[in-house]
Curated annotation (Swiss-Prot):
Its cofactor is Zn(2+). It comes from the Bacteria. It comes from Prochlorococcus marinus (strain MIT 9515). It is found in: Cytoplasm. GO terms for biological process: alanyl-tRNA aminoacylation. Zn(2+) binds at residues 564, 568, 666, 670. NCBIfam families: alaS. One of its GO terms (molecular function) is tRNA binding. This is Alanine--tRNA ligase. GO terms for cellular component: cytosol. The gene is alaS.
Length: 886
């Protein structure tokens, strides 16, 4: 045991360091925190300290060491409604953990946990309560006999509380939890561990000793494991003697900064105000780590979680009467608090603040209008808001559904979630119909039988031609014995030279043949590493179990290889020219072009595009070799190889390396030297969603074809405009100036025509007391001319005039225009042109708006024009009469 003279760790940094130092002294390998974006496609975010070790626990990856310890950053949003409300709920938190992979077990785990909390953290035994699984007599005995915990301090709980499992089947085991008792003077009778004011669970020891089969039966694991977790924020609350986690040195500086911005004092604030301040403190830590780890705000996946947190912060800022931008101030405090432990925060600070500012400005642009709609819904008195309205808030004003629910629930109003889902699905269907994507889904018996086949051996890295045995044939989604002439089929071989579509690269084209039979292959789909060769039988027939020849189209393969290598070079260039945080969000390596999606908060400038293009072309001309090797995954990542987020990799990975330029995990095909790419040209750069940009580019012969086509276009323009290519800009500029002058002349003539049409109207104005009223139909005038006419007439008739004009600007287009103009006297009396024009245009299936003194609208139903003008005449006649009587 260590001497208790050692100083007690107090600050969050000291508590974290003491934990890791302690377990390092027990021969644990200290593992740095993994990203919040896990290397596990089944999980969106790192939600637990053990998640990075999940492949080790499941036997899918070699253990880094028999013993390990870490401080892992984690993020959960399942209890987001409790954040700031309770003393201990968070989205972002740090989990301190020690792990054993088939090494030590219960005795050591319990002894070391006790040594840590009593000798290092100096917690008093009388403040500690232990819980155990009621059937785990072994753990209870260790606590009682080895540690000396009296039976009254050991609480037996059932499987719901003290038995961990990874799912319905698989590794599982009992756990033992350590609780801190804030009020030990209340005694040990009738202890209720659910009493959150008295007890806090701060250390959980999981003893992974069983495997549960599909029948629910438990059997002993060959290797027993230890998985523990201690919440850093909870231990800080205990050691710093705070009433909640938010008042520890880990979060309070952010909370105080938020209070300073809001010009209030945290400690003297009421509970509702404190909740908003705590939410800002919690969410700040979450957003800076999400952005630093590469997440960009969007409406999908992790990006949606980030956007939801950011917009929730802005909303709580509004509740604190903060109107201006403020999130970057909180983020700066959060970064300064954590940058020593997480240096990436300091390195990525500029990008973090930029992303926050962009998203904050984006939401503020629509926040006022969205809040107005929300307030209208609340004032309506309805207790169930339609899914249509909730979707409008989401789609038009950027309110995440959860934020809308949260705001309305504060007023005891519910949201029609099924209706919202229907609206969302309808939007997806509209998008799907518009995109006209090719369906490569496996259907029918293919989907059912695919698992019956062995994985296809791919031989296409070294040769475009090979032999393989036909293992399966599918026609119209059904398994058949042979493929005959004219049929479109899917063929499965035991081995092939065809590349199957994956990693963004399209599948090869070519032929499968045998004697006089031949199949034209137009695409190859990969499903669970089984290759389906899709094509049409051009002649003869091919049967199952026959030996066939595979011949890949070398020209298409060469174009794909060129585009794939160019894609790797492009990503490296973007990281150097734009920002090192740029990472791939999607790609397509085709025969005729390449497409690369990446995170960027703003469009690339023309200069940046030119720099990226030039850098890629310089690497091409330098004739770098392409080195391909298989490596241990961890070694490859340590060497700097880039991995695609969300991709699942095995222990051994294929690495494509352009030494000194690019290094990526990649299963695709590539050229042998960069000079084989030939040349590179970016043809477009666009935004495809919030924070995500897309580059389309060409390489090799396709670049020459592109310039040839442009040259032909330039020559045609030269002939058309009767100017040499070098004079085209000058000629076009001259034509544009000419066009502007012609348009001005046309508008002048329109104004003259309009004047002739309306000039006589002022003399026919109806007098109602001291007021003048003109309501008339004038056809053939566009919106600008109709507006000029109304304003000119109002000016002539004075501040007690009303002018309403409606007409058909173009009989072929069959639409209506309306304008309403009020004199100043009528505006002072409360009349509003915008409101009136809405009523008028609605009669003709239209709509519009404007200011109190002037408004305009459009409409579709030209047959209702007279009805609309008559409605206006009657309405205004009565109002003007009432004003004249006063």
């Amino acid at each position: 045991m260590k001497s208790q003279s050692q100083a007690t760790p107090i600050t969050g940094d000291e508590i974290r360091k003491a934990f890791l130092d302690f377990y390092e002294s027990k021969s644990h390998l200290i593992i740095p925190s993994s990203s919040l974006i896990p290397d596990d496609p089944t999980v969106m975010l790192t939600i637990a300290g053990m998640l990075p070790f999940k492949p080790v626990f499941l036997g899918l990856r070699n253990r880094p060491s028999p013993r390990a310890s870490s401080s892992q950053k984690c993020l959960r949003t399942n209890d987001i409604e409790n954040v700031g409300v309770t003393a201990r709920h968070h989205t972002f938190f740090e989990m301190l953990g020690n792990f054993s992979f088939g090494d030590y077990f219960k005795k050591e785990a319990i002894q070391w946990a006790w040594e840590l909390i009593t000798d290092i953290y100096h917690l008093k035994p009388e403040n500690i309560i232990i819980s155990v699984f009621h059937e785990d007599h072994e753990s209870e005995k260790i606590w009682r006999d080895n540690i000396g915990i009296i039976p009254e301090r050991i609480i037996r709980l059932d499987e719901k509380d003290n038995f961990w499992s990874s799912g319905a089947t698989g590794p599982c085991g009992p756990c033992s939890e350590l609780y801190y008792d804030f009020n030990p003077e209340k005694g040990l009778k009738n202890i209720d561990l659910e009493d959150g004011d008295r007890f806090i669970e701060f250390y959980n020891l999981v003893f992974m000793q069983y495997n549960r089969d599909s029948n629910g039966m438990l059997s002993d694991l060959k290797f027993k494991n230890i998985d523990t977790g201690m919440g850093l924020e909870r231990m800080a609350q205990i050691l710093q003697k705070k009433t909640n986690n938010y008042e520890t040195d880990l979060i309070l500086p952010i909370v105080k900064e938020a209070a300073l911005i809001a010009n209030i004092d945290y400690f003297s604030s009421d509970d509702r105000t404190k909740i908003s301040l705590k939410i800002l403190g919690d969410h700040t830590r979450a957003i800076i780590h999400l952005i630093s780890d590469g997440v960009v705000a969007s409406n999908l996946g992790r990006g949606y979680i980030l956007r939801r947190l950011l917009r929730r912060m802005i909303r709580h800022g509004r509740l604190l009467a903060i109107k201006d931008d403020f999130l970057s101030r909180l983020a700066s405090i959060g970064i300064s608090l954590m940058q020593n432990t997480y240096p990436d925060l300091k390195n990525n600070k500029e990008r973090i603040l930029r992303e926050i500012n962009i998203e904050e400005k984006r939401f503020l642009e629509t926040l006022d209008r969205g809040e107005k709609l929300l307030n209208d819904l609340i004032r309506s008195g309805e207790k169930l808001i339609s899914g249509t309205k909730a979707f409008e808030l989401y789609d038009t004003y950027g309110f995440p559904l959860e934020l809308t629910k949260e705001i309305l629930e504060e007023k005891n109003i519910n949201v029609d979630l099924e209706g919202f889902t229907r609206e969302m699905e309808a939007q997806k269907e509209r998008a799907k119909a518009a995109s006209q994507k090719i369906d490569l889904t496996l259907k029918g018996s293919i989907e059912r039988e695919i698992d019956l086949f062995d994985q296809t051996i791919f031989e296409g890295y070294d040769s475009l031609n090979s032999q393989g045995i036909v293992k399966g044939i599918f026609f119209e989604s059904n398994s058949v014995e042979k493929a005959i002439q004219g049929q479109t089929v899917q063929i499965i071989l035991d081995q092939t030279s065809f590349y199957g579509e994956s990693g963004g690269q399209v599948g090869d084209t070519g032929t499968i043949s045998r004697n006089d039979a031949e199949i034209d292959i137009d695409k190859v789909i990969r499903k669970k590493n089984i290759f389906l060769h899709c094509g049409t039988v051009r002649k003869g027939e091919i049967c199952r179990n026959q030996l066939v020849e595979t011949r890949v189209d070398k020209f298409n393969r060469a174009k794909a290889e060129s585009n794939h290598t160019a894609t790797h070079l492009l990503q490296s260039a973007l990281k150097l020219i734009i920002d090192k945080s740029v990472s791939q969000r999607g790609s397509l390596v085709g025969f005729n072009k390449l497409r690369f999606d990446f995170n960027s908060p703003q469009p690339l400038s023309k200069e940046q595009i030119s720099q990226v293009e030039s850098l890629v072309n310089s690497w091409i001309s330098e004739n770098h070799p392409i080195e391909v090797k298989n490596m241990d995954k961890d070694d490859a990542l340590k060497a700097g190889a880039l991995a695609m987020f969300g991709e699942k990799y095995g222990d051994i990975v294929r690495v494509v390396d352009v030494p000194g330029v690019s290094m990526e995990l990649c299963g695709g095909t590539h050229v042998q030297t960069t000079s084989e790419v030939g040349s590179f040209k970016i043809i477009s750069e666009i935004g495809i969603s919030s924070g995500i940009r897309r580059i389309e580019a060409l390489s090799g012969q396709l670049v020459l074809d592109y310039f040839k086509e442009r040259d032909e276009t330039v020559n045609k323009l030269s002939d058309l405009l009767k100017a040499r290519p070098s004079q085209l800009f000058e000629r076009i500029d001259s034509l544009q100036t000419e066009l502007v002058n012609k348009n001005k002349e046309i508008q002048r003539m329109k104004d003259e025509i309009a004047y002739f049409k309306y000039s006589s109207l002022s003399s026919s104005a109806k007098k109602i007391g001291s007021f003048s009223l003109i309501i008339n139909q004038i056809d053939g005038l566009d919106g600008s001319s109709l507006q000029s006419a109304a304003l000119d007439l109002t000016s002539k008739l004075g501040d007690k005039s009303v002018v309403i004009l409606g007409g058909i600007p173009d009989t072929e287009k069959k639409k209506l225009l309306f304008v309403v103009s009020f004199g100043d006297d009528l505006v002072r009396r409360g009349m509003h042109a915008g409101k009136l024009i809405n009523e008028i245009s609605r009669i003709c299936s239209g709509g519009g708006g404007g200011k109190p003194n002037f408004a305009q609208a459009g409409a579709k139903d030209i047959d209702k024009l007279n009805d609309a003008l008559e409605y206006a005449r009657k309405d205004l006649w009565e109002k003007l009469l009432s004003y004249s009587d006063k």
